[in-house]
């Protein structure tokens, strides 16, 4: 990181594959969001329900029902300060000392760092560059132990940009089903999909498997 900063200071163009910030690449807030913020700024409150504002949770719930999630209610929704806070809260609740979580490789480092902070162990499964960075299903199976608690799926993936097919997601869900694991779905970029591809929500594909998205 320090070396990259030094290179930038010398005018060298550094391509950042670690930056999970679409705003750096020209993606801005939609005008509808900006207008709503400006219109309601005087109604802002310093604190609300610990899970987030009820109106916002209702809208989020409706959005995910429209994406195919079943059985979700507004009380199931927690609004966090980005994926970072969500991951910290989730892993602190889910894993303890020595527990393992399966993470894709390459992976957004937030997840492995939080696993370590919780006393857990990140175990990386391979995403094959020769196969458009898709998860290696057999490698996932081989990494499961009696300490495995969950499988993380980052889709669309950060940093590779891969968008997983329904077949790949169903295969991962089946592994979680067979081994009684929790599915963790980092889908923060679900609408940042290009090239005619379509994002599929793994929670919608496997409603019988515990999933946090």
Regions found by a protein language model. Give the residues of each.
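N-terminal small-domain helix-loop-helix segment of the aminotransferase-like
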Residues: 1-82, 89
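Helix C-cap/helix->beta junction micro-motif
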Residues: 10, 118, 178-179, 209
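Conserved PLP-anchoring active-site segment centered on the Schiff-base-forming lysine
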Residues: 93-115
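A short helix-loop-beta submotif of the ANL/AMP-binding
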Residues: 117-123
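Active-site phosphate-binding strand-loop segment of PLP-dependent enzymes
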Residues: 123, 128-199, 203
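Active-site PLP attachment segment
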Residues: 204-213
